[in-house]
């Protein structure tokens, strides 16, 4: 395109060159024949004709150059911009919906106004109350309330099971201590009987014989009774303390369940 543009420029210059020469020749001829009025008139007419032709030629060349420049710019723009394929116009869903609405409106306008029924709508909409739960979680749901209650009951059951284990351990220790208390008097009784037998064998002639086993047995029975009473008292104290702990934990569990139900 640039080469074509340069060629057109050279052509226009070459075309304008003889026009300038003819103008110079006309000027020189007019200066030579200025004294002849008839020749002067013909020369002037010829000069006007040449000037008009040169102006038309220059205007034509300028138009050609402008058209070439426009074609050059348009070709460059077409090369830069990719061609977009022409797709057929598909009516969108919104346009179809608008057309359907227009048809419905036209149909409704065609009907009689006497068939229309006016219904009064309520001005105030019903409002459902919002129950706000506790801050720990979603207390407004029933499932959450049941899960919370199940967690509380499970924790109370675990505490009761642990308390029962502790009570069983305490009762086992008390039973072991009672058995130890029952066995210890027997050993002491045997030891006392042996000592008394030795003492009686040494002093058999000087002192009368006493029934040492009966005496030892009475002492052992008295000590066993005292130990049994102490064990019973300790067991009753443990039972009362366990009962108080159970009642306190049950009260706490009930209070926590009631709080969860109130907040829910």
From Swiss-Prot:
Residues 97-118 have a biased composition (Acidic residues). Keywords: Biomineralization, Cell adhesion, Cytokine, Glycoprotein, Phosphoprotein, Secreted, Sialic acid, Signal. Residues 31-51, 186-212, 252-264 have a biased composition (Basic and acidic residues). Glycans are attached at residues 106, 109, 204, 242. Belongs to the osteopontin family. A motif (Cell attachment site) lies at residues 132-134. Residues 1-16 form the signal peptide. It comes from Gallus gallus. GO terms for molecular function: cytokine activity; extracellular matrix binding; heparin binding. It is found in: Secreted. This is Osteopontin. Pfam families: Osteopontin. One of its GO terms (biological process) is positive regulation of bone resorption. Extensively phosphorylated on serine residues. Residues 21-141, 166-264 are annotated as: Disordered.
């Amino acid at each position: 395109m640039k080469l074509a543009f340069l060629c057109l420029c050279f052509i226009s210059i070459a075309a304008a060159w003889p026009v300038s020469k003819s103008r110079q020749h006309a000027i020189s001829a007019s200066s030579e024949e200025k004294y002849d009025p008839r020749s002067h008139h013909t020369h002037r007419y010829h000069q006007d004709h040449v000037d008009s032709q040169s102006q038309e030629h220059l205007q034509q060349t300028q138009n050609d150059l402008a058209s070439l420049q426009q074609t050059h710019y348009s070709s460059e723009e077409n090369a830069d911009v990719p061609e977009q394929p022409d797709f057929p116009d598909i009516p969108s869903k919104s346009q179809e919906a608008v057309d359907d609405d227009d048809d419905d409106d036209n149909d409704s306008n065609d009907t009689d106004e006497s068939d229309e029924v006016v219904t009064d709508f309520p001005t105030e909409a019903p409002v459902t109350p919002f129950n706000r739960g506790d801050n720990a979680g979603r207390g407004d749901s029933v499932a959450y309330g049941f899960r919370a209650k199940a967690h509380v009951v499970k924790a109370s059951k675990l505490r009761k099971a642990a308390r029962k284990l502790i009570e069983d351990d305490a009762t086992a220790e008390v039973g072991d201590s009672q058995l130890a208390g029952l066995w210890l008097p027997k050993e002491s009784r045997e030891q006392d009987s042996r000592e008394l037998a030795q003492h009686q064998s040494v002093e058999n002639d000087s002192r009368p014989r006493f029934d040492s086993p009966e005496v030892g047995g009475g002492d052992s029975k008295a000590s066993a009774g005292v130990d049994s009473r102490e064990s019973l008292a300790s067991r009753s104290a443990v039972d009362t303390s366990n009962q108080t702990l159970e009642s306190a934990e049950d009260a706490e569990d009930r209070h926590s369940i009631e709080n969860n139900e109130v907040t829910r």
